[in-house]
Amino acid sequence: MKNILDLKYEELVNEFQRIGLEKYRVDQVLNWIYKKKVFEFEKMTNLSKEHRKLLSEKFFIDLPKLLDMQISKIDKTTKFLWELRDGNTIESVALFHSGRVTACISTQVGCPVKCEFCATGQSGFVRNLTVGEIVSQILAIELNRKIKVGNVVYMGMGEPLLNFENVIDSIKMLNDKKMLNIGIRRITVSTVGIPEKIIALAESGLNVKLALSLHAVTDYKRDQIIPLNKKYSVEELIYSLRKYQEITGNRVTIEYILIREFNDYPEDAIRLVELLRGLSVYVNLIPINPVNPKFHRPNRWALERFKEILEKNGIECEIRKEKGTDIDAACGQLRRRKLR
């Protein structure tokens, strides 16, 4: 049996025709799933009983099981703990701002990158998520929170570009008008930096937004907090961004976590200006969230000083207003966990 949520539109048409069902039946089923949020074939009443039985024998619709839902008392940010079919768990987040809802979704169970400041990698890496497990997070968020997701960021658990094929297919399904119908420019892929995959993303023609988690401006410092940097240097990352912009023309968001007396010095800001020269970028400055006790948030004056140096050199930036910190739903705080 196949999970319908793993299949793109053309694949579903082929699968349905293989079992003797017309193409328009695909549209009917997708309307039930993606528009009406009905996930049992038996309840799809514009299909005959015979067709419902046939579909139940050949396919299943796999939504993650909700284990826990926490809602921030500060800003309504909602964190979801899901159990997958094999018993593994992942987390997703819904962010609320200016009448819009952004879903922050996971792409892996755990994470192999193991950034020092991130909770996800501390629980180890298990496996990549399937296409359906990525897409179903949006459906499950909408179902359980009674909301409509308008923006999606691949910024939850895992490194999206290390699950490249499934992420690409899931983006196509999010954007498909017969499925979730989310505008392509409302989808952002956030990566710690896999240069060849950044270029491949540009060459895919999908035209999604890209965010690079840079966090340090020298290999010496980045090696200390992002082990993967020992394989892909800062220079290689910046080169891949230049290639990305040559191909797409899109502005790139640079994520920069600020850690007190580590990467928050004026010389770090000046080096960042030099690195980004000639690129069209927007820089998010993120005071580190409490995960690793050896790292501390910078002083407010250090934050403002860093921001001022960037702005004086023509780089648009902001100090990110963190959401969901009271429920551990902010940047770097998602982890693989079980309910006690």
From Swiss-Prot:
One of its GO terms (biological process) is rRNA base methylation. It is found in: Cytoplasm. Belongs to the radical SAM superfamily. RlmN family. [4Fe-4S] cluster binds at residues 111, 115, 118. S-adenosyl-L-methionine binds at residues 158-159, 190, 213-215, 289. It is an enzyme of class 2 (transferase). GO terms for molecular function: 4 iron, 4 sulfur cluster binding; metal ion binding; rRNA (adenine(2503)-C2-)-methyltransferase activity; rRNA binding; tRNA (adenine(37)-C2)-methyltransferase activity; tRNA binding. Its cofactor is [4Fe-4S] cluster. SUPFAM superfamilies: Radical SAM enzymes (SSF102114). One of its GO terms (cellular component) is cytoplasm. The active site is at residues 91, 331. It comes from the Bacteria. Signal peptide: none annotated. The lineage of its organism: Bacteria, Thermotogati, Thermotogota, Thermotogae, Thermotogales. InterPro entries: Aldolase_TIM, Elp3/MiaA/NifB-like_rSAM, Methyltransferase_A, RlmN_N, RNA_MTrfase_RlmN, rRNA_lsu_MTrfase_RlmN/Cfr, rSAM. Disulfide bonds join 104-331. This is Probable dual-specificity RNA methyltransferase RlmN. It catalyses: adenosine(2503) in 23S rRNA + 2 reduced [2Fe-2S]-[ferredoxin] + 2 S-adenosyl-L-methionine = 2-methyladenosine(2503) in 23S rRNA + 5'-deoxyadenosine + L-methionine + 2 oxidized [2Fe-2S]-[ferredoxin] + S-adenosyl-L-homocysteine; adenosine(37) in tRNA + 2 reduced [2Fe-2S]-[ferredoxin] + 2 S-adenosyl-L-methionine = 2-methyladenosine(37) in tRNA + 5'-deoxyadenosine + L-methionine + 2 oxidized [2Fe-2S]-[ferredoxin] + S-adenosyl-L-homocysteine. Keywords: 4Fe-4S, Cytoplasm, Disulfide bond, Iron, Iron-sulfur, Metal-binding, Methyltransferase, rRNA processing, S-adenosyl-L-methionine, Transferase, tRNA processing. It holds the Pfam family RlmN_N. SMART domains: Elp3. The gene is rlmN.
